């Protein structure tokens, strides 16, 4: 079974969103990359662990919308704070 890069012991809140995991991608999130990642990793993670965050460190196109339970971030996430639920 595949697991996310960071599977949280307890849910955390990031920008008002409850997350259970974080997946890190050292790639740019274009439509093809995001749809591929959703199908092969991210949607299965939401089914197993609940909602989570995917970070495209080099950014993503603005037109991408969060899939259900999957929240998109870029490298600026390092400026954000996680807090306990």
Predicted regions mapped to residue ranges:
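Domain-level recognition of nuclease-like catalytic cores that cleave nucleotide substrates
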Residues: 58-85
């Amino acid at each position: 079974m595949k697991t996310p890069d960071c599977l949280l012991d307890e849910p955390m809140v990031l920008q008002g969103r409850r997350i259970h995991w974080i997946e890190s991608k050292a790639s740019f999130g274009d439509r093809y990359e995001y749809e591929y990642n959703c199908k092969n990793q991210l949607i299965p993670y939401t089914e197993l662990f609940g909602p989570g965050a995917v970070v495209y460190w080099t950014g993503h196109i603005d037109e991408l919308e969060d899939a259900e339970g999957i929240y998109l971030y870029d490298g600026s996430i390092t400026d954000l704070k996680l807090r306990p639920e």
